């Protein structure tokens, strides 16, 4: 098999494994790829691939920390499991603060930014697990807080 074709197969297998959301260590990913016949794979190659494809560690449905590929989701929607990544939503006089699972804040902020001013969102600032959201003109912080709660099916 040509080198580029072999590389394409490796990338395809790598992405398929991460979509399973069951690998909590790079060593587990290496072992799974070796089982599929990729004998030249090692931890450093897996580490580079994780970085290249923007993989993050987050909690799966079983609440286990696993590697996943948020970039594969495209523009997320609130009907997807992303709402499970939101842990807490609170506000003060200036901003709404959203706490997420580690590594999920930028993905959730992207969703909020895509909704924009029509939903009362002027903009977001995201770290690793925290998002600051400020209301657009004509919206109060409390109104924005309630809109975000509704988006993620959270209780008041």
UniProtKB/Swiss-Prot annotation:
GO CC terms, sorted: cytoplasm
UniProt KW keywords: Amino-acid biosynthesis, Arginine biosynthesis, Cytoplasm, DNA-binding, Repressor, Transcription, Transcription regulation
SUPFAM superfamilies reported in the protein's UniProt record: C-terminal domain of arginine repressor, Winged helix' DNA-binding domain
Pathway: Amino-acid biosynthesis; L-arginine biosynthesis [regulation]
InterPro entries with a match to the protein in the record: Arg_repress, Arg_repress_C, Arg_repress_C_sf, Arg_repress_DNA-bd, WH-like_DNA-bd_sf, WH_DNA-bd_sf
Entry GO MF terms: arginine binding; DNA binding; DNA-binding transcription factor activity
Main localization, broad class: cytoplasm
Entry keyword Transcription: yes
Its job: Regulates arginine biosynthesis genes.
The name this protein goes by in its record: Arginine repressor
Species whose genome carries this gene: Escherichia coli O6:H1 (strain CFT073 / ATCC 700928 / UPEC)
Taxonomic lineage from the root: Bacteria, Pseudomonadati, Pseudomonadota, Gammaproteobacteria, Enterobacterales
């Amino acid at each position: 098999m040509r080198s580029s074709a072999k590389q394409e197969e490796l990338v395809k297998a790598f992405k398929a494994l991460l979509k399973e959301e069951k690998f909590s260590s790079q060593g587990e990913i290496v072992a799974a790829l070796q089982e599929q016949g990729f004998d030249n794979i090692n931890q450093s190659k897996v580490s580079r691939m994780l970085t290249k494809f923007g993989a993050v560690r987050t909690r799966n449905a079983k609440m286990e920390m696993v590697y996943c590929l948020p970039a594969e989701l495209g523009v997320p929607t609130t009907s997807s499991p992303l709402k499970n990544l939101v842990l807490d939503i609170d506000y003060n006089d200036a901003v709404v603060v959203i706490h997420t699972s580690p590594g999920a804040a930028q993905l959730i902020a992207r969703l909020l930014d895509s909704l924009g001013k029509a939903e009362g969102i002027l903009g977001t600032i995201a770290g690793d697990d925290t998002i600051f959201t400020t209301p657009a003109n004509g919206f109060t912080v409390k109104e924005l807080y309630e809109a975000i709660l509704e988006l993620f099916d959270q209780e008041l």
